[in-house]
Regions:
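Peripheral, non-AAA+ core regions of ATP-driven protein-machinery
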Residues: 3-13, 17-86, 93-99, 106-116, ...
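Conserved RecA-like ASCE P-loop NTPase motor core of nucleic-acid helicases/translocases
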Residues: 125-129
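Divalent metal-dependent catalytic cores for phosphoryl transfer on phosphate-bearing substrates
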Residues: 134
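P-loop (Walker A) phosphate-binding loop of NTP-binding proteins
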Residues: 103, 130
Length: 458
């Protein structure tokens, strides 16, 4: 007699399980996230591949005093791609599980294939694809140049077969492309379902820790920009990297939103070319290329991403509104922050912006959320409103408070040094930060207490 199947409902956001459908998840509070999955009644909770492996390993587990554990940061493996190493915190940690997410066509597979190319020069690397054939991967690899014989390909989606190959071949690095295509025979649901993604990730986690090899897994993203599948997926891995950018543009930005072995503030900048992804060593110069001359509403500001200062062009367009409700649009920065700064300008400087449309854009498509760009947004709006260009060789940074004061920001000396290196002659910054940058020569420093002082300069 065939075994029956029972229905369970999983939350797509957090992976919470319920016996019946609910409108709101009691675990994470999200609405309309439960999906139904059919499970064999013969497979009970706790009898999947990973849980059986866990019970077997418990018998052999040994406790070790913390004082006897040796940890050497030199054990990190450099990928040879400096922008990626920067985001990872200095290289790949052995035994780590890294999730790489991003929109389709953004370059996730290309980046990981380039990592495999670098590491296969002196390590045995296994690239497992569930989406492409070996011939398709070879066509993509031909654009990048020659590959070492240490790079091996496996086109498979069955979790049990993949686990057996990894344990047999013992590679020094594994890439899984992608986690949504993997499935286990022990889980009675379709590939890409909540239970399949969770089970597959758990198995790869055990392989990474047990064999002490780094495992990279590619994850698709939803329309909201988060990794598809249960939210618990991001909790299970050691590092979560997001590949951002417009696939119709050439630049790409790699961000770490979770990193157990490094900072989550660093970014890596790449440019997509015919031969693959090329590192952009000086993002500031890249972001400012093509800036218009003597244009009102344009100003250069400086933001810090991790330890790296990046100069960006902030553009604003303020014009009379023909509608009863003026339009406010922000691209690359927080929309509510723009509204707040415009309210400060109206209240503290008496600017009549209530009947004006306002459009604020961070040129190049990069997104900045640091408060240090507040003063740049204010200056760009005033410049456009009064139709007065700001000197091209001037850079600004500072946080703006509700009283109109310009507050200090961190690392002002690095910001000024970056501006000087790129040929800027004047820097408008918070007055309280002047004493920290007085040692830098060759650039004129103007300290301001409030936005009124800054606006007088233009």
């Amino acid at each position: 007699m065939a075994k029956g199947k029972k229905s369970v409902f999983f939350c797509q956001n957090c992976g919470h399980e319920e016996a019946k459908w609910l409108g709101q998840c009691p675990a994470c509070g999200e609405w309309n996230t439960f999906v139904e999955e059919k499970l064999d009644s013969g497979i009970t909770k706790g009898t999947t591949v990973s849980s059986r492996q866990t019970r077997e390993s418990v018998r052999e587990a040994k406790v070790v005093p913390l004082t006897e554990v040796t940890a050497n940061d030199d054990a990190r493996c450099r990928t040879g791609i400096h922008e990626l190493d920067r985001v990872l915190g200095g290289g790949i940690v052995p035994g780590s599980l890294v999730l790489v997410g991003g929109d389709p066509g953004i370059g996730k597979s290309t980046l990981l294939l380039q990592v495999c190319r670098k590491l296969s020069e002196y390590k045995k690397v296994l690239y497992i694809s569930g989406e492409e054939s070996q011939a398709q991967i070879k066509l993509r690899a031909n654009r990048m140049g020659d590959f070492s014989e240490n790079l091996y390909l496996l086109c498979e989606t069955n979790l049990e077969i993949i686990s057996g190959v990894i344990e047999k071949e013992r590679p020094e690095m594994v890439v899984i492309d992608s986690i949504q295509t993997m499935y286990s025979d022990e889980v009675a649901s379709a590939p890409g379902s909540v239970s399949q993604v969770r089970e597959s990730t758990n198995v790869f986690l055990q392989l990474a820790k047990g064999l002490c090899i780094p495992v990279f897994i590619v994850g698709h993203v939803t329309k909201e920009g988060t990794v598809a599948g249960p939210r618990v997926l991001e909790h299970m891995v050691d590092t979560v990297l997001y590949f951002e950018g417009d696939r119709h543009a050439s630049y790409r930005i790699l961000r770490a939103v979770k990193n157990r072995f490094g900072s989550t503030n660093e970014i890596g900048v790449f440019e997509m070319q015919q031969t693959g992804l090329v590192e952009v060593e000086n993002p500031s110069e890249y972001m400012l290329s093509g800036r218009p001359e003597n244009a009102s509403g344009s100003v250069v500001a400086c933001s810090i991403e991790g330890t790296r200062p990046i100069l960006i062009e902030i553009q604003a367009l303020v014009c009379h509104s023909n509608f009863g409700m003026p339009r406010r649009t922000a691209a690359g920065t927080d929309y509510n922050r723009v509204n707040l700064l415009m309210a400060v300008l109206e209240k503290r400087l008496g600017m009549a912006l209530g009947n004006s449309d306002a459009y604020v854009n961070i040129a190049g498509g990069i997104r900045m959320s640091e408060p240090a760009v507040d003063l740049g947004i204010v200056m760009a709006i005033v410049s456009s409103f009064r139709n007065r260009p700001i000197d091209e060789k001037t850079i600004v940074f500072g946080e703006v408070g509700l009283s109109g004061e310009v507050r200090a920001v961190n690392m002002p000396e690095q910001r000024v040094a970056e501006a000087k290196k790129l040929g800027f002659e004047t820097c408008i910054l918070p007055e309280v930060s002047l004493k920290m940058v007085k040692g830098i020569k060759g650039i004129k420093l103007i300290g301001v207490k409030n936005i009124g002082d800054a606006v007088k300069i233009i």
